[in-house]
Amino acid sequence: VVGGDECNINEHPFLVALYTSTSSTIHCGGALINREWVLTAAHCDRRNIRIKLGMHSKNIRNEDEQIRVPRGKYFCLNTKFPNGLDKDIMLIRLRRPVTYSTHIAPVSLPSRSRGVGSRCRIMGWGKISTTEDTYPDVPHCTNIFIVKHKWCEPLYPWVPADSRTLCAGILKGGRDTCHGDSGGPLICNGQIQGIVAGGSEPCGQHLKPAVYTKVFDYNNWIQNIIAGNRTVTCPP
């Protein structure tokens, strides 16, 4: 996250870090939505993925941190683009449910969608500098706004006007998600409204907001997958 500050240690109990068994680098974020399921972006998938919950600082452990491996990973079966970026959403079922604790708790799925002008919060362990490869020891947070979708369409050819995405940022620039924040949540009014999908390079440029998968449109898919209906397709 560029243009942010260290998150409050108690404001992100649902935020998870994704890395692999072969690398301790956090390549993506994600969000815990119940004791057994994590929501993230499809492009965050890796072999040998690991999920760390209850983490704040990479160096100073929270006493209630937990690590999990996937029992299953679920994607949209009906993507239009071969890379699946038009439906950039993935559900990870944890091999063992987590125990909720001080720093581990779920975030609610959206009860309604949020419109242009809504103020939302972004968070993650991604890059904090637009010019250098600086990654923080702690997650950074900041507030951005949902903006008109037309700002994103020319920037990201895989997000047509009818795509189930949100365009969000600060039009004058300066505050944005960045490398390593992918898959993390866009939180509006205490609910997860978006998943970090893609952005411009470098991050936080003037008139270049980022694109987020619109979670509200996938509520039905998410609930079906969790309920055990594996044949459900994502909205077109």
Swiss-Prot record:
One of its GO terms (biological process) is proteolysis. Transmembrane segments: none annotated. Glycans are attached at N229. It is an enzyme of class 3 (hydrolase). It is found in: Secreted. Expressed by the venom gland. Inhibited by D-Phe-Pro-Arg-chloromethyl ketone (FPRCK) (97%), PMSF (76%), and benzamidine (50%). Is not inhibited by BPTI, antithrombin and EDTA. Residues 1-227 form the Peptidase S1 domain. It catalyses: Fully activates human clotting factor V by a single cleavage at the 1545-Trp-Tyr-Leu-Arg-|-Ser-Asn-Asn-Gly-1552 bond. Cattle, but not rabbit, factor V is cleaved, and no other proteins of the clotting system are attacked. Esterase activity is observed on Bz-Arg-OEt and Tos-Arg-OMe, and amidase activity on Phe-pipecolyl-Arg-NHPhNO2. Pfam families: Trypsin. Disulfide bonds join C7-C141, C28-C44, C76-C234, C120-C188, C152-C167, C178-C203. The active site is at H43, D88, S182. One of its GO terms (molecular function) is serine-type endopeptidase activity. The keyword Magnesium does not apply. SMART domains: Tryp_SPc. Belongs to the peptidase S1 family. Snake venom subfamily. Venom serine protease that activates factor V (F5) in a calcium-independent manner. It cleaves the Arg(1545)-Ser(1546) linkage in the human factor V molecule. Induces the coagulation of mammalian plasma. This is Factor V activator RVV-V alpha. The lineage of its organism: Eukaryota, Metazoa, Chordata, Craniata, Vertebrata.
